[in-house]
A protein has these predicted regions:
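N-terminal glycine-rich phosphate-binding loop and ensuing alpha1 helix
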Residues: 2-50
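Short beta-strand segments
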Residues: 9, 98-100, 128-131
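Short, high-confidence coil segments that cap the C-terminus of an alpha-helix
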Residues: 43, 91-93, 120-124
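Short phosphate-binding loop-to-helix
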Residues: 53-116
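Conserved core of the sugar-phosphate nucleotidyltransferase
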Residues: 106-160
Length: 160
C-alpha cells in the first residue's frame, strides 16, 4: 500500500497576519503545534513546506521534517506541489493531506477521521469543515465558508 503524507504549507508573509507561522501558542510556534497534532494522528509522515529560513530552522529544532520551497507561490497548494515533487519524485505517495498551518486547535482525531473517510468513499478530494456557530465568523470575509448538502449519507460541499 502506498503511504499517506501530511504537508503543511507555511510562509511568514501572510497578507492578513505577517509572521503567523511562528506566533507563540502557549510556548510553541503555531505551525509546530499543527505539526505535532498531525504527528499524533499517526496517519503518515508530516512535513512543513516553507520558503522562510526562520520557519525552516524552527521546524528543525523541533525535529519536524521540512522542505524549502520557492517564495513565489501564489497558493499553499502550489507550495505543496513543489514540496511533493522534491519528496516523492517517483510518485509512490498515494494520499496527500494539505493541512493548514494556522489550525493549531485541530484534533488528531479529525485527521484520522478524514483518512478513514477516504478509505470508505470513492473520491479524490476531501475537506474538513465545521459548523460556524459564532455569528461574527459568519460574516467575516477572512473565514472560509462551505455550503453543504447531504445525499445518500454523503456530504457534498462547495467553498464560498
Amino acid at each position: 500500500m502506498k503511504k499517506t503524507l501530511i504537508i503543511i504549507p507555511s510562509r511568514m508573509q501572510s497578507s492578513r497576519l505577517p509572521g503567523k507561522p511562528l506566533l507563540d501558542m502557549e510556548g510553541v510556534p503555531m505551525v509546530i503545534r499543527v505539526a505535532i497534532k498531525a504527528k499524533e494522528s499517526n496517519v503518515g509522515d508530516v512535513i512543513i513546506a516553507c520558503c522562510d529560513k526562520e520557519v525552516y530552522e524552527v521546524a528543525k529544532s523541533y525535529n519536524i521534517d521540512v522542505v524549502n520551497t520557492s517564495a513565489d507561490h501564489v497558493s499553499g497548494s502550489d507550495r505543496i506541489y513543489e514540496a511533493l515533487t522534491k519528496i516523492d519524485p517517483l510518485k509512490k505517495i498515494e494520499t496527500i493531506i494539505n493541512l493548514q498551518g494556522d489550525m493549531p486547535t485541530i484534533s488528531s482525531n479529525s485527521i484520522n477521521n478524514l483518512v478513514n473517510l477516504k478509505h470508505s468513499i470513492s473520491s479524490d478530494i476531501f475537506t474538513l469543515a465545521n459548523e460556524i456557530k459564532d455569528e461574527n465568523e459568519k460574516i467575516d470575509p477572512n473565514v472560509v465558508k462551505v455550503a453543504m448538502s447531504i445525499k445518500n449519507d454523503n456530504r457534498y460541499g462547495k467553498a464560498l
